């Protein structure tokens, strides 16, 4: 008997998709406050923007990002409950640089074949990240890509919308020579540099090492979720005038720090003040990589930077430490070409 032609036989199981939505519904809706109108499953997510009345002149901020090839490490290790935190962190930390308060978040998940248990773990991480950011998970899309992705492969993208008072928006324009750079410690490599990490730490860049200790190192240090700085920074902004901020992502220091600097200023970092930590020290020790290449690829122990005047540096440090951050004065602003980053 000839097989019946169906969408399911082509590789897309819509019934399993509906079951998945029901499975995650309660968890997702736990991020919803009174601002979210309606529940999960509609054609659009609805958000009550009357919250913007607290601003004199509200500016909306938006951001989108993914987690790169860190996903491949999560897939190999079969650990799926933290990669969603990474996804939220990469987005909310970016709009935070402008002083933005996250309002709502959306996600996109593409997979070769829908595995409800795996996807539930991924979404649970996204929910956790949203709660840490005080953002509502307003909606999302999960798409099966049979024939174009392997069954156990998946990819993630996130989208965030936030708000900031126009007069309080931070753009780096007031940064001057003599200002101090405060660095907030990262949890590890966060979500950047994983193509190099996989090349260095995986067999042929594709397979888990056979040594259990090396696998443990990957689990304990490389896969640790990206730190979310939202609550600490928003608390700081209420008390101290901040001139500029930097989220250290792809391209490390050399790509990210110049983005916030005005012409005629330059960042100068004191290498001995940067707490690279065990993960980066081991990478440096075990592999012959030039130090400047490490700073151009990784966060080297500092996930987020705050630039303040010299007179505000100590107070800003204390406020962030009171929020649980580990903070170091890692550099200063000097005169020079903004595109050149000094390490001394």
Curated annotation (Swiss-Prot):
Which SUPFAM superfamilies does the annotation name?
Answer: PurM C-terminal domain-like (SSF56042), PurM N-terminal domain-like (SSF55326)
Q: Name one Pfam family in it.
A: AIRS_C
Record pathway: Purine metabolism; IMP biosynthesis via de novo pathway; 5-amino-1-(5-phospho-D-ribosyl)imidazole from N(2)-formyl-N(1)-(5-phospho-D-ribosyl)glycinamide: step 2/2
Q: Is Ligase one of the keywords?
A: yes
Superkingdom per UniProt: Bacteria
Write down the EC number. 6.3.3.1
Reactions listed under catalytic activity: 2-formamido-N(1)-(5-O-phospho-beta-D-ribosyl)acetamidine + ATP = 5-amino-1-(5-phospho-beta-D-ribosyl)imidazole + ADP + phosphate + H(+)
Q: Which GO terms describe its molecular function?
A: ATP binding; phosphoribosylamine-glycine ligase activity; phosphoribosylformylglycinamidine cyclo-ligase activity
Gene Ontology CC annotations of this record = cytosol
Q: Write the record's keywords in alphabetical order, separated by commas.
A: ATP-binding, Cytoplasm, Ligase, Nucleotide-binding, Purine biosynthesis
Where is this gene product found?
Cytoplasm
Q: Which GO terms describe its biological process?
A: 'de novo' IMP biosynthetic process; adenine biosynthetic process; purine nucleotide biosynthetic process
Family according to the record: Belongs to the AIR synthase family.
The protein, known as: Phosphoribosylformylglycinamidine cyclo-ligase
